């Protein structure tokens, strides 16, 4: 399994007696893992219960979206609402693999110039550190000199919400950003070979492209 956080989720599931699932798909996955079987439900001497609670991340995103405009992140980066692309790259299988990182940045440059659109990329410290090492010198120079591909410092939670809700498109390898793009009804390109949030792809709101 490539996603460490998914391993953590499974471990937490196994240790829990009450599970709150965000979707019906998640409940079905628990069923496939045997959580509805009698011997599993009463494994620790008391019934293990599963509830469809809805996704509290959705409530959280909508709540803070009311305040995100206070950040002025769009104005400070000369961005117009619904006229830019938000990108994030931080997963080690992308940042630590020169071929994958090169492919992603070549694609970002191509999209920005072909479509004449700004792409804003808040740089994760991991990505920032590895770009000079894992990008070819020629590509690295093009990236840092590009006027359309805007590399900026990491942003706050509210600033990220503001960038997500006003983007035309989101390109990301982040699980959380995928979901927030979905909540704000933004199409999402997923830079991973798989996603744990299968509902996003099933509803046609995201596409898995890998790198």
Task: Please provide the spans of the model-predicted regions.
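A conserved, positively charged/aromatic
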Residues: 2-17, 164
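Short acidic-hydrophobic, aromatic-tinged amphipathic segments that line or gate anion-handling sites
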Residues: 21, 51-53, 150-153, 207-211
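A nucleotide-sugar donor-handling region in carbohydrate enzymes
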Residues: 15-100
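Donor-nucleotide binding loops and adjacent catalytic segments primarily
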Residues: 67-166
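A donor-sugar binding/catalytic signature common to diverse glycosyltransferases
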Residues: 1, 19, 160-200
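Short beta-strand scaffold positions
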Residues: 21, 52, 122, 171-172
């Amino acid at each position: 399994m490539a996603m460490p956080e998914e391993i953590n989720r499974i471990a937490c599931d196994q240790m829990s007696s009450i599970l709150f699932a965000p979707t019906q798909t998640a409940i079905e996955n628990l069923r496939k893992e045997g959580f509805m079987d009698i011997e599993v439900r009463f494994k620790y001497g008391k019934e293990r219960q599963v509830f469809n609670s809805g996704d509290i991340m959705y409530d959280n995103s909508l709540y803070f979206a009311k305040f995100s405009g206070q950040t002025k992140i769009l104005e400070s980066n000369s961005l117009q609402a619904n006229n830019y692309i938000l990108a994030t790259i931080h997963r080690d299988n992308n940042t630590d693999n020169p071929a994958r990182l090169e492919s992603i940045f070549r694609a970002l440059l191509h999209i920005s110039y072909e479509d004449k659109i700004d792409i804003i990329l808040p740089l994760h410290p991991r990505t920032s550190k590895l770009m000079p090492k894992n990008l070819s010198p020629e590509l690295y120079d093009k990236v840092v000199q590009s006027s359309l591909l805007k590399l900026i410092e990491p942003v706050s939670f509210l600033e990220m919400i503001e960038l997500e809700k006003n983007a035309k498109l989101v390109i990301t390898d982040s699980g959380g950003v995928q979901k927030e793009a979905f909540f704000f009804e933004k199409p999402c390109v997923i830079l991973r070979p798989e996603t744990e949030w299968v509902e996003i792809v099933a509803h046609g709101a995201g596409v898995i492209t890998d790198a």
